[in-house]
Amino acid sequence: MGGSRELMRILGLDYGSKTVGVAVSDMLGMTAQRLEIIRRPKENHLRRTFRRIEELAKEYEIESIVLDYPLNMDDSVGDRAEKTLAFKRELEERLNVPVFLVDERLTTVEADEIMAECGIPRSDFGLYVDMIAAEIILQDYLNNMTNTASKVSL
């Protein structure tokens, strides 16, 4: 198999008001696997959230992070997107790794569809949605990286 792809791991995050869904790529940067949901009691209580992300980044030897960017449907930047930008800046400062923003519109809808197909009761969707959304966001990013690399190598 030709081509030399660097071994790297990327963390995918779905940042919400009280949770952060977490996914991680395999070492080849080809597939995303969901990891966990980091929960916090209040929106601005982020100390434990950052500490846990730092632990995961160290454990998985993360080289970059992909973070959801919740633009409005008309492409405008709303309150959630502003909070995500502040979260991004703090991540970059604390972890010293690049953080890439990915348009995450409709990932929750896609996550709901996946859970329904898996037979998860709708009443339990809240237990998994952020983690699955993080996996979708990261997988979309990885797919785009692979497609770009394929086009360049042709």
What are these regions (language model features)?
Residues 2-11, 18-154:
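Phosphate- and other anionic-substrate recognition elements at nucleic-acid/protein interfaces
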